[in-house]
C-alpha cells in the first residue's frame, strides 16, 4: 500500500486555507465545494493475448477508493464546519465504465468511494458523467461478450446513487420524465438557482428487470430537446432577481469539449438569449409524436445573471470566457489523477 500521508496533509491544509478565505466573504455570496472525476472502480487492461480481461490488483483498487473517500471526508468536514458553504457538488464520472463484473460490483465500489458524502450536513448535488453508465464495453470491439445487464440505467442512477445522499429540499425535477438526471436547486436566501444539467441524457429503454432492451449505440453525449425545454420553461423561470449557476459534467458544447455535444449549440443560444435579454426559439418532436415549439423569451425586467458554468471531464484546471454569451466557464481537474485511463472505447466514435 502506498504512503499518502504527505499528500493527505497538503490536501487538508489547502482545504483549511480555502475555508479561511470563504469565512471572510460576504454572507450573500454563493460558495460550494466541487469534486469531479473520481473514477473509483477497476481499470480493465489487456492480457498477453491482447484480450481485455485483466484487472488491476485488488490492493491497488482498494487503495485508490480509500484515498478518494479520505479526501471527500476532509471536504465534508470543511463544509459542515463552515456556514458560508452552501452545498457540495459532484461533477460526475464517479466510475470508469470498463467493468465487466456487472453493475452491482461497480455500484459497490462507487458507494465505498463516496460514502463520506452521506455525512454531509449540506445538500449533495450530483451530475452524471459519460463514464457513469458502465457502458464503454459496447464501444470496444475487443469485448464481444458485453452484457446489457452491466449497464447502469437512469433508474439505477436515481435510486442507487443520488437518492442515497443528502438531497436538497425543493429540488426541481422534470415531471415529464420520472428518471431525469437534471434538476435545479434554489438558494433562496442568496437569490440563486443552481441548475444541474445532464450531458448524457440518452435515455436507454429498459425492461421490468432494469435491463436495457433497446438500441445500444445511441448518441450518448447530448442534451435532449426535452431537457432544454425544461431548462427554458421550468429551470430558468426563477424570480427576476435570481442569479443562476450551471453545473454539469461537460462544458456547454463542442467549442469547450473534445466531444461533439448534441444540443450544445441550442444550449449556447438559450444562454445567449438570457444574457442579452432577447428571444430564441426551437422546435422538436416529443415521444408522442407531437410537434413542440419552445420560445425562450427573456425580458429586460430580469435583473439576475448567469454567474458561471462549472464542469469537469477535461481532467484539467481551466478558466474560460465566452465573449459571445458573456459567460465564465470553470473546469475543475479530476480527484483521481489516473482517472479515465484504460483500454476502453471512445465516445468520439458514437
Identify the residue ranges that each predicted region occupies.
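N-terminal active-site segment of His-dependent metallophosphoesterases
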Residues: 1-104
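A short linear-motif detector with a strong N-terminal bias
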Residues: 7-14, 67-68, 104-105, 172-175, ...
